[in-house]
Structures are given as C-alpha cells and as structure tokens.
Amino acid sequence: MENNNNNHQQPPKDNEQLKSFWSKGMEGDLNVKNHEFPISRIKRIMKFDPDVSMIAAEAPNLLSKACEMFVMDLTMRSWLHAQESNRLTIRKSDVDAVVSQTVIFDFLRDDVPKDEGEPVVAAADPVDDVADHVAVPDLNNEELPPGTVIGTPVCYGLGIHAPHPQMPGAWTEEDATGANGGNGGN
C-alpha cells in the first residue's frame, strides 16, 4: 500500500550531506545497541506517562536512536545555515532559522527562543565581556552597599567557582558518562 502522507521524514532534496545521512540511516543496519543517550533516563521519562504500564525491551533503544538521528539532522541543517552565512559556529539564530523554515520542525517553534539579532562583538578577553554586563559600584565612595563582594559575580558568571544551578531532573555529566556505577545509563 502506497503512503501518500507527507508527514513522515523525507530525505532533503537540496543538500548532498543531508541526503547521504538519511539514505545511510534508512537503508543501513540500525545498530540500536550502541546509543548516545542514557537508556535508564529514557525509561524513566517514558514511565512518567500514566498510560504507560509496560515498556518493551527494544523501545528505549529505538527511542535513543531516533533522538540521536533527530539531533544529528537538526545540527546538520543548522550547520548548513551557518555556512551559508559564512560562519564556522552554529548560533541560536541558525537553529531558529532551521526550525522556522522546515515544516517537520514546526512542533519546536514555541520552544526554540527567537534570536533578537543582537550585535556580535568579538571580545579578546571573556572576563572583559562579562564585566561589561555587570554593574560595578562606584569605588569613589568608601562604603560599599551591604552584601557587595567585588569580583565574585564576574567569576560566578564564567562558572569558575561554582557550578551553574541545575534544573531538577536535568541530565548531568555523571548520567551521560555512567559515573553512578553503570555503563552510560544502560
């Protein structure tokens, strides 16, 4: 039976790299045993749905492979957009452009932050770049406001002294590398 529904993923017709990626992914042997995403985390996410009572053994592996292919496709499309703009780095604006121009990524439109087109300034020293955005108290006054510590906000902004706060349930490096006694979340 022929499927005339265009809602499924089609290989892109305009770019050889994307065509090659999808043709290899669709016709090749999908090795779902080697995965990039932690399977235990995927199982936990699947179990959050109250309608899910049992999970087949291969379902988390297939979902991991699907996520890997999805991220790779979005990254490749963003990279191509960055190259079209004569840049070597993928920016928010590249991901935003890909999401807004590609029909299959419509579901991400509300979740990908819009790039406001902020001017790009090349900073030689990252501390100088952060210091421009931090309010510095007037040092001509002998007394500083209570609770003011000079130097700490700049260092904290760079993540030197303390780790950034993490959302509850977010992945950590330990989850990805398997530092909890597992082998990468398997």
Swiss-Prot record:
Please list the GO terms describing molecular function.
DNA binding; DNA-binding transcription factor activity; protein heterodimerization activity
> Know the name of this protein?
Nuclear transcription factor Y subunit C-5
PANTHER family with a match to the protein in the record: HISTONE-LIKE TRANSCRIPTION FACTOR CCAAT-RELATED, NUCLEAR TRANSCRIPTION FACTOR Y SUBUNIT C-1-RELATED
The tissues where this chain's protein is expressed are given as: Expressed in inflorescences and flowers.
Top-level division of the source organism's lineage: Eukaryota
GO CC, sorted alphabetically, is: nucleus
Which Gene3D superfamilies does the entry link to? Answer: Histone, subunit A
Alphabetical list of SUPFAM superfamilies matching this protein: Histone-fold
Q: Where in the cell is it found?
A: Nucleus
Q: Name one Pfam family in it.
A: CBFD_NFYB_HMF
Which protein family is it in? Answer: Belongs to the NFYC/HAP5 subunit family.
What keywords are assigned to this protein?
Answer: Activator, DNA-binding, Nucleus, Transcription, Transcription regulation
Annotated source species: Arabidopsis thaliana
Q: Lineage from the top down?
A: Eukaryota, Viridiplantae, Streptophyta, Embryophyta, Tracheophyta
Instruction: Identify the main location.
Output: nucleus
Q: Where is this region: Disordered?
A: 166-186
Outline what the protein does.
Stimulates the transcription of various genes by recognizing and binding to a CCAAT motif in promoters.
Q: Quote the subunit structure annotation.
A: Heterotrimeric transcription factor composed of three components, NF-YA, NF-YB and NF-YC. NF-YB and NF-YC must interact and dimerize for NF-YA association and DNA binding.
Among its keywords, does the record have DNA-binding? yes
TM annotation in the entry: none
